[in-house]
Each structure stands twice: as structure tokens, then as C-alpha cells.
Amino acid sequence: MPYFATAGTGLIDAGNGKDTLSGITPLWSLNDNHNQINSQQLTIMARRKNADHGAMLHDGDGYMTAWFAYTLTADRDAAKAFTGSRPEILENSLWQDVHIK
């Protein structure tokens, strides 16, 4: 199944980086979850810089919309955000810790 996980780097999402109980979606957890997925389809995780949990509804909307357009309707323009030799999300300086497999 396709998989796209997003989170922010703010304290509510990321936690303090030291306490494993801190944060809703700390980087270690995102990495662990993404690494455990065994899928033949596209899987992506990414964190939006300087955003926190509440902001991700609008800060992540463009990529989430493109993700659904690509995975549900095979929209070729939307696919460019995630596929090809230079996926747009990898070039976007507002995002970090982007992993595509």
C-alpha cells in the first residue's frame, strides 16, 4: 500500500529529541515506522520545518492533496512531487528528513 507520513519539527510533533515519550511524531518514530513498511508501492515520510502539529493541516496540504491525486487518480502532474529523478519534495527547502522508498 502507498504510505505518506508528515509531521512538523515543532515541539508538539517532534518532542525534545531526548525523551522517547516526548512529542506526537518524533523523528525516531517516523523513521522506525517508515523502515518497517514492506511495500512494493511508494512510501514517503517528511517533516515540515518550523511547523507544529496544528499548522500541519495547512502547511502540509499541498503535498497531501498531490499525494491523493497521484495515488488515487494517477495524476501525472501530482506524481512529479514524489517521483522521477528529482522529486519536488526533495528540492523544497521547507521540508527536511524526506525519505522516499
What are these regions (language model features)?
Residues M1-R76:
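Active-site-adjacent alpha-helix of alpha/beta-hydrolase-fold enzymes
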Residues D59-K101:
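Catalytic active-site module of serine/aspartate enzymes centered on a nucleophile-bearing elbow/loop
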